[in-house]
């Protein structure tokens, strides 16, 4: 769970507290600290690790890092090490962090792996790109930054079987989608990957990332195996403690409530768009997504202008959302907030 450099055999030490230049172990012994504040394993990281292992069925072992970008980078790296292969299959408009995204424009900061890019939800196109030299397939069970496009269950089932057949690694990026079901969208779809990456809200507002999977893959990081997972702040006490607290707050009932509000908002926006569209014309705006995640799409020649108009109109109505049309319902939103936003969209379409 911790950076490799804080582990040592035969008796790894867990730190309970620190003061001045001293640290105290869990068994009460105080040590003069010459570790340059590198820290060490702490109680909260064990609690958070258990929370995540209990919550996500595909995770038998988990390791922590500082962001979703790091989590995906580490997952891809260990998948290549585990399989001994280099090629990775990704999907158009997939976003897996600062160094692994595949939008409309080439990203000069992408890590230089051997990527092949398939069309999301397109089984036939993906079949064409499958090969026995693939190390991994990585995808979100719902495209997030790519427009809140849910995966078709049959598409995920196809990928699961294909990866099993070629003995590669299937990675679900659930950094966003894990908030949509208490056990992640993998459980909603009943399709389970070999590895799962996590981040964002699971750190309780602090920098956080995590990646985990089955024992065989995660054992590649065991001492003596030669694969080093470093990071001074991987298991920092603030993120671990905030993550534990957030995990206790995020209950199945609260997720269901947020999802219901998101469904209502999505339906309301689509209804407003249809109500005010000129006769024999297509609605200018379409809301997609799943549960508490809503994505706005614009049609026609003036898509960017329309997107900007919606954003600034909503700001004028004291409603703040992502400029690209990214809307996330959280645990403290109530039905009257959703009604307010739907009425704001009514006002926008009336003025339009």
Question: Which residues are covered by each model-predicted region?
Answer:
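Conserved N-terminal phosphate-binding loop of PLP-dependent enzymes in the Aspartate aminotransferase
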Residues: 1-352
């Amino acid at each position: 769970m911790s950076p490799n450099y804080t582990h040592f055999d035969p008796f790894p030490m867990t730190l309970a507290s620190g003061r001045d230049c001293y640290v105290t172990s869990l068994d009460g012994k105080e040590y003069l600290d010459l570790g340059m504040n590198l820290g060490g394993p702490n109680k909260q990281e064990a609690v958070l690790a258990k929370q995540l292992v209990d919550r996500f069925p595909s995770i038998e072992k988990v390791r922590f890092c500082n962001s979703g970008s790091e989590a995906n980078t580490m997952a891809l790296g260990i998948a290549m090490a585990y399989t001994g292969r280099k090629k990775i299959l990704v999907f158009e408009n997939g976003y897996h962090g600062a160094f692994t995204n595949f939008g409309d424009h080439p990203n000069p900061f992408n890590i230089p792996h051997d990527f092949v890019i398939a069309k999301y939800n397109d089984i036939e196109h993906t079949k064409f790109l499958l090969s026995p030299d693939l190390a991994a397939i990585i995808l979100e069970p719902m495209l997030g930054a790519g427009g809140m496009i849910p995966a078709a269950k049959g598409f995920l089932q196809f990928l699961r079987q294909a990866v099993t057949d070629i003995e590669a690694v299937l990675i679900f990026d659930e950094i966003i989608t894990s908030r949509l079901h208490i056990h992640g969208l993998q459980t909603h779809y009943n399709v389970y990957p070999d590895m799962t990456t996590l981040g964002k809200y699971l750190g309780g507002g602090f920098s956080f990332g995590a990646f985990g999977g089955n024992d065989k893959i995660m054992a590649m990081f065991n001492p003596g195996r030669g694969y080093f997972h470093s990071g001074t702040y991987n298991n920092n006490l603030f993120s671990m403690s905030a993550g534990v607290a957030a995990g206790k707050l995020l209950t199945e009932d609260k997720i269901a409530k947020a999802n219901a509000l998101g469904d209502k908002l999505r339906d309301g926006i689509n209804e407003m768009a249809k109500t005010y569209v000129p006769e024999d014309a297509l609605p200018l705006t379409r809301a997609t997504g799943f549960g508490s995640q809503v994505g706005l799409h614009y049609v026609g020649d003036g898509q960017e202008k329309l997107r900007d108009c919606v954003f600034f109109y909503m700001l004028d109505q004291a409603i703040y959302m992502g400029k690209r049309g990214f809307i996330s319902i959280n645990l403290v939103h109530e039905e009257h907030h959703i009604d307010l936003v739907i009425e704001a969209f009514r006002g926008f379409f009336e003025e339009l």
